[in-house]
Amino acid sequence: MTESPIVLDVEIRNWVVIPILIVLFIVSALKLNISRIMQINSGKPQDVEKTMQMQTINRVRRLVSFYNRIPQKSFFIRKAYLCGTTGSKTNKGILSSIAPTQEDSNPMNMMFANSMFTDPSGITDMLKGNIMHLIPQVTMMSWVNHFFSGFVACKLPFFPLTIRFKTFLQRGIEMGSLDVSYVSSLSWYFLCWFGSEGINAILLGENMVSADSQLLQSSIEPGPPTQQTPIHKIYASEKENIEMIRYDSLMTNIEDRFLDNIKKKTSFDFNQINKNNNNNNNNTSNIKPKPIKSNLSNSKQSKRITYQKPSSLI
């Protein structure tokens, strides 16, 4: 026995489903702008030396990933700038400019150095982020639960779901006989909240991190900080990666490879087309021009035009 589908009112779509979507997008945009303002006004000083080191590491990794897209001369210039010139005492390269530092004998001191336990601004920023994600979600959930409680908002047009999804898709509706594919208003809000990350990234122009993952990370108690790798060891490993590269340009024979890809995707035989074009050109060159006949003989056969005098007036 098949169950007859429930016909939902159009007003539910206009006054429940669409308003939740619009308000959720507006709240996401406001949350993003407020978080940017809070980051600008935080005034946390940045270490210039560490910033330069991170930019150097990013530059080296980009070169390792995309070295075959630049000319060979440009690659060797960058390699000499980063790794230095072999046999030269003056040009040792940026990656060899930092000398190894004396490491602390106690590893716990190294682990807790430059961590959030010694830097109070890190704890402040973490609290600000948690507040910025927690307050809008609690407010939105209370708003939906107060104004739209008890509504069957929509039906999922998917394959039949199991009974395990009932507690997630029908929050606020206590009906055991209702099909699992029907979604309540509160569950519709949660579905939109979990699935709005990609839409916000496209419309707002920002790669936003999902709020649920940030709330999950903030709820977990932080453990001891991990030991940071010294910068000279990172430089040494990146230098080895550059020196292991054997340059092979991606632009070599790119025309032939492009034509091969087209041949694989299409059924055209370009060699046969070229032969046909050459044969057509040869045929047109072998055709002799026909002599043009003059039309002077036709002029002799033209009719004579006679002129008659008008009759005299009486």
From Swiss-Prot:
Biased composition range(s): Polar residues: 294-314
UniProt-annotated stretches for the region Disordered: 272-314
Organism in which the protein naturally occurs: Dictyostelium discoideum (Social amoeba)
Protein name as it appears in the record: ER membrane protein complex subunit 3
Subcellular localization(s) per the UniProt record: Endoplasmic reticulum membrane
GO biological processes: protein insertion into ER membrane by stop-transfer membrane-anchor sequence; tail-anchored membrane protein insertion into ER membrane
Job of this protein: Part of the endoplasmic reticulum membrane protein complex (EMC) that enables the energy-independent insertion into endoplasmic reticulum membranes of newly synthesized membrane proteins. Preferentially accommodates proteins with transmembrane domains that are weakly hydrophobic or contain destabilizing features such as charged and aromatic residues. Involved in the cotranslational insertion of multi-pass membrane proteins in which stop-transfer membrane-anchor sequences become ER membrane spanning helices.
PANTHER family according to UniProt: ER MEMBRANE PROTEIN COMPLEX SUBUNIT 3
Cytoplasmic-side segments: 39-130, 205-314
Family: Belongs to the EMC3 family.
